[in-house]
Amino acid sequence: MFYKFLLFDLDHTLLDFDAAEDVALTQLLKEEGVADIQAYKDYYVPMNKALWKDLELKKISKQELVNTRFSRLFSHFGQEKDGSFLAQRYQFYLAQQGQTLSGAHDLLDSLIERDYDLYAATNGITAIQTGRLAQSGLVPYFNQVFISEQLQTQKPDALFYEKIGQQIAGFSKEKTLMIGDSLTADIQGGNNAGIDTIWYNPHHLENHTQAQPTYEVYSYQDLLDCLDKNILEKITF
């Protein structure tokens, strides 16, 4: 299969969300006078991941996630806080974090040289993702950035990809590849939309989901090799 349009997930695929989250949380917790910051982080991080999974499964709304995660955090430690206000402060700090994964810029440079059209396709809050992208220096690589909040739908919904396709000139599913680390969002989303996928799996995780990636890679070099192999097969054919 010869691909032209590459849709990239951002967090944990190109952007270092863990580093960004750690800095933003530290700033927020210091602002709130928290003494044992690590204890709060240890509770918040898995709780937040679980809430995002619930959002993917449509068990909760985005508004509920955003407005309650910090009130839940502080409630766990016996404090009553305005979750909505804390969410605004956290988003302010997080939007300033543009840490990228090692090699991300080189990867995108290589793909541009190979004449691919690159697009960002991310679940998230517009103000945060646009801010982080601006800080990261990745914006010039992308023809367009698609954010779930703006599209009013999110991965893994097929509608997310349908709306993206409507905005890309010459778009065809057969020439499109979704690249990301999340089986339940990126890969399942590609499956739902009828789009081929690359599961970026640098930690060699096992797949215990129903999502079926077209390809699986463990590094950026693997990703390039996978795409180069497809080009060679196309030329040979």
UniProtKB/Swiss-Prot annotation:
One of its GO terms (molecular function) is magnesium ion binding. It comes from the Bacteria. Strict requirement of divalent metal cation. The highest activity is observed with combination of Mg(2+) and Mn(2+), followed by Mg(2+) > Mn(2+) > Co(2+). No activity detected with Ca(2+), Cu(2+) or Zn(2+). Gene3D superfamilies: HAD superfamily/HAD-like, Putative phosphatase, domain 2. InterPro entries: HAD-like_sf (IPR036412), HAD-SF_hydro_IA (IPR006439), HAD-SF_hydro_IA_YjjG/PynA (IPR011951), HAD_2 (IPR041492), HAD_sf (IPR023214), PGP-like_dom2 (IPR023198), Pyrimidine_5'-ntase_YjjG (IPR052550). It is found in: Cytoplasm. Its EC number is 3.1.3.5. It is an enzyme of class 3 (hydrolase). Keywords: Cytoplasm, Hydrolase, Magnesium, Manganese, Metal-binding, Nucleotide-binding. GO terms for cellular component: cytoplasm. GO terms for biological process: deoxyribonucleoside monophosphate catabolic process; pyrimidine ribonucleotide catabolic process. Homodimer. PANTHER family: PTHR47478, PYRIMIDINE 5'-NUCLEOTIDASE YJJG (PTHR47478:SF1). This is Pyrimidine 5'-nucleotidase PynA. It comes from Streptococcus pneumoniae (strain ATCC BAA-255 / R6). The lineage of its organism: Bacteria, Bacillati, Bacillota, Bacilli, Lactobacillales. The gene is pynA.
